[in-house]
Amino acid sequence: MSSDSLHTLGRWTSDRAVATPDRIAVDDRGVQLSYRALDARATALAEALGTAGFGIGDRIATITGNSSDQVALFFACAKAGVVLVPLSWRLSPAELASHLAASRPALLLVEDEFTSLADAACELLVDGPPRSTLGVGGIESHVPPIRREGMRESRPVRDDDPLLLIFTAGTLGTPKGAILSHANCFWTNLALSRTAELTSADVVLAVMPQYHVGGWNIQPLLAWWVGATVVLERTFDAGRVLQLIPDRKITTMMGVPANYLFLAEHPDFAATDLSTLRHAIVGGASMPEPLLRTWHARGVALTQGYGLTEASPNVLCLPDEDARTKVGLAGKPYPHVEVAVADPVTGEQFSGAATGELLVRGPSVFSGYFEQPEESASALRSGWLHTGDLVERDSDGYYRVIDRIKDIYISGGESIAPAEIESVLFGHPAVADAAVIGVPNARWGEVGVAFIVARRGVATDAEDLTAWLRERIARFKLPHGIRFVDSIPRSAADKILRRSLLADYLSHAPSNREPA
């Protein structure tokens, strides 16, 4: 590792083990791990991976909640040149199987809590990966030899070597694994450090799941770079978070607007001592003004912004001083990030105030999707990442996200592809046609509503279709409403006219909000 390139992340724990060996790196539900201990575990596991035949570019997938065991594995992978593929435990077995098939890991590590889920997913695979468990009682005590003829190239880890493979929703409902390199992660964390600074004195509360890019690159990795402490939580629970802030003296955290809404609505919010919480990051969507004011009234500074997995994810930043006067904006580009506004059809780039598709380039932009050259070529054109998001840039250079050109909507921070839900609905014998759209929701930002054209002579209702979906997709993807219609508006090319559906929905919804 000593000869690895300068921007490789395996160096980070080694450096901290020398600089602040006894500082707590991870507080995992009360079990604490110092930087010395974290680096020792990561180094030992990296060496064991190499001995077992794992090398540059090999992939290890995990199904686990946030844990110090996965943190140790992450840095072991960074030191060994192995790619970590953290998979979502919220997926259905069929969805999880598709992610495993798409990523082809050499090893799957499963936390005991998710054994049944992993079993069901692997049963759907023709040739599933070898399996083990995380932690000192599993992978750290024995690494199964990799199933491969010959050995991987033995060389130092380079900046451009892949480090993370994070799945993001595909526009056609197919899983897409975004490849993030060491350099991608280095540069996005460097940019974050210049806009939402952390020091070794900070205590970061991490509630974002580690199968999301934000679970790594929005605060936790920066914290481990500078020697701060990260308090890991398995899932978000408003009551527990309000206990942890004063108990652990949390100084900063990251969440989606729904997280901050649940906290503000909790009966203990007003009485909770938030004096240590100097700062919080908001991602996933813009924070509504009333909620923004609620947190400002409690003395918490809020940094908002915009990002996407393919950009590691940080693209636009709205610091607290701007957020107080520029409500609803996404901000300006992070340092080391270049953006442009272009015509979505012609690709012509506009100068000055303009509306168009947001393009991104810079060292934090990914290199492509794993083994999906066509999808990669579509996303990366002429050196620019085409986000598929429609933005408005004002004369002062501030950006506002006004619509998504692609159909994915975001609910509670989760990206959801309507086509995936539609394809499952089409499998129901009573469904003749279907369309799913995201509609505004005060609690979740957006929720899904399904429009159904029923087949004549086949009985069904909303409860029946919801039960059908619940067996086949993750719970967070379930539409919050199902409406039966005579027809689905479509273009001459048979494309669903989602904006027409949304306009019709909003014109007939009394509150313009689907219930939570």
Indicate residue ranges for each PLM-predicted region:
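Conserved pre-ATP/AMP-binding loop-to-beta segment of ANL
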Residues: 6, 149-167, 174, 197-203
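Conserved AMP-binding/adenylate-forming
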Residues: 31, 46-94
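Conserved AMP-binding A3 loop
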Residues: 34-36, 163-187
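AMP-binding/adenylate-forming catalytic core of the ANL superfamily
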Residues: 91, 362, 367-368, 375-378, ...
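Conserved AMP-binding/adenylation subdomain of ANL enzymes
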Residues: 186-203, 211-252, 266
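Gly/Ser/Thr-rich phosphate-binding loop
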Residues: 225, 247-255, 264-325, 338
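Conserved beta-loop-beta connector loops within the AMP-binding
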Residues: 306, 338-359, 395-396, 458-462, ...
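Conserved ATP/PPi-binding loop(s) of AMP-dependent carboxylate-activating enzymes
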Residues: 316, 332-336, 348-379, 416
